[in-house]
């Protein structure tokens, strides 16, 4: 079911991969910095969520403007035969992927702060979860592009 949905919307895979990787990397960088400074879980969460909202919004708007510019250029040249899809959908896919995968490095901190689950090694958990997120991104890309799972 999910695989069919993804294949029906494969023209947006680039935005998904771009948003997901940037979301997880930048959020992980915030978590790593805050963890290195021994900041409280609450502060790590505030910084991480602020990054998700601001950077995700920026990426979504950037994707929209980039797609819009490509469409305008295509209309000007009339020679471009590549379908670029809706700029609005591209922006939403980039933003959604940024948020959905970008939150992964914060899961251990969210679990402790909101669910009161004591996780002794939150930063190591964040590393592991971010690694799993990258594997997930590769598997998603592999399923759409029909490339080998290791190559993706």
Region spans (language model):
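Hydrophobic, small-residue-rich transmembrane alpha-helices and their short perimembrane loops
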Residues: 1-109, 116, 120-133, 141-143
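Interfacial loop-to-transmembrane junctions
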Residues: 136-152
């Amino acid at each position: 079911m999910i695989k069919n949905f993804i294949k029906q919307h494969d023209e947006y895979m680039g935005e998904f991969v771009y948003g997901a990787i940037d979301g997880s990397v930048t959020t992980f960088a915030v978590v790593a910095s805050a963890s290195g400074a021994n900041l409280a879980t609450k502060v790590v969460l505030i910084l991480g969520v602020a990054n998700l909202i601001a950077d995700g919004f920026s990426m979504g708007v950037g994707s929209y403007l980039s797609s819009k510019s490509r469409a305008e250029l295509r209309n000007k040249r009339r020679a471009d035969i590549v379908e670029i899809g809706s700029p609005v959908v591209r922006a939403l896919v980039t933003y959604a992927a940024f948020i959905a995968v970008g939150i992964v490095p914060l899961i251990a901190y969210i679990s402790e702060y909101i669910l009161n689950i004591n996780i002794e090694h939150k930063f190591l958990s964040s590393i592991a979860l971010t690694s799993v997120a990258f594997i997930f991104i590769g598997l998603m890309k592999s399923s759409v592009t029909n490339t080998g799972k290791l190559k993706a």
